[in-house]
Amino acid sequence: MTRLFGTDGVRGLANKKLTPILALRLGQAAAEVLTSDRESYERRPLAIIGRDPRVSGEMLDAAIASGLASRGVDVVRVGVLPTPAIAFLTDDFGADLGVMISASHNPMPDNGIKFFSAGGKKLPDEVEDRIQAAMDNLTEDGPTATKIGRIISEAPDGRERYLKHLAEVVTTDLSGIKVVVDTANGAASKVAPQAYEAAGAEVVAIHNKPNAFNINEDCGSTHIEKTQEAVVEHGADLGLAHDGDADRCLAVDAEGNVVDGDQIMAILAVGMKEENDLRFNTLVATVMSNLGLKLAMQEQGIDIKETAVGDRYVLEELNRGDFSLGGEQSGHVVLPDDCTTGDGTLTGLSIMARMAKSGKSLKELASVMTVLPQVLINVPVSDKAVILNAPEVKEAIAAAEAELGETGRVLLRPSGTEELFRVMVEAAEKEQARKVAGKLAAVVAAV
């Protein structure tokens, strides 16, 4: 049986792979699985649904809400809000489950559905498998009359609750900091500028006018050059770029240099260690993090725990070890004491708070880490499963590792959300990394 769930929920081309019928059935199955172990039966199960502003979101929102209600779940639809806001609100409302409809940084025609359990936590693989199994065994025998769930549309205070939460978490006065924020015409188009302004920062917002069709279009964290240009143009102290669902954040210093997720983690880790907030002096990162992060943390006396790629695996390790900071090079930064998932807006606030407390520029803070040259090539493939077992790929990897020696590394892995295979090479020199990565990518493409 083909697994329906990827590393970040169910994704696909909206109305083709991800249809309203599929969304309805997902809602029904999730209702059965996620409400079966409830401790309290004093009220009906409750679900929170949010979405990003892409055009298919309204259609899928209505479908999954109907599926949940048809299985006796009351539904609160909070409208367009970031993924971390839905995780927070699931907990804040005391809901039994949360649903976010978004394809994150993917192009507008795609969409996705991800679930949160009670407390706003991402689902483990085992629970997702139970939902898929429940879909295969759905019947028409649903509740009737008064046992059907109610649907409350566009709950008015969801955004206000989330903004209040952010203000309570980051209390540092950000007055005197000028920030450009690119919201990717996505889910944070309103809340991110509002949160930064509420903290005292002077905000220049760009790509913050979603029209259902322009999400991630030449903007946001996947087009960081737009933020770089705007920071220089407006003479800002920094820039922050989010993706479509605002669970990630990349930064730009005053000179227009990119500060990626690894550098952001290094900045926050050092600051948290100074304030005795970095539990066990440990940072959780993935195998894709730059070798420079490991070297910098060693210098600072900070340990690194490595995980597979994907913020869900970072979250699992954070929870397992009770650590207080983790993330990915892509800009997913997780502060588990304050949010159950990556939160781009909270990350932005935390970066600016570190600047305000230290009196240092972002460039000065980022200098704690030297980024080694890294080349990443995304290779479209038809069957991700066969790549790593192909003899020619194994031979190419061995040759690349021999060429790089101890001054670099090679990592090949399938994308969890797209039909791509990622080829990553780090080396002492950029040209060497580019050359080795190009050779490997050509071999992968030919399989």
Curated annotation (Swiss-Prot):
Its EC number is 5.4.2.10. Transmembrane segments: none annotated. Activated by phosphorylation. GO terms for molecular function: magnesium ion binding; phosphoglucosamine mutase activity; phosphomannomutase activity. GO terms for cellular component: cytosol. The keyword Isomerase applies. Mg(2+) binds at residues 104, 243, 245, 247. Binds 1 Mg(2+) ion per subunit. It catalyses: alpha-D-glucosamine 1-phosphate = D-glucosamine 6-phosphate. Keywords: Isomerase, Magnesium, Metal-binding, Phosphoprotein. One of its GO terms (biological process) is peptidoglycan biosynthetic process. Its cofactor is Mg(2+). Belongs to the phosphohexose mutase family. This is Phosphoglucosamine mutase. It comes from Corynebacterium aurimucosum (strain ATCC 700975 / DSM 44827 / CIP 107346 / CN-1) (Corynebacterium nigricans).
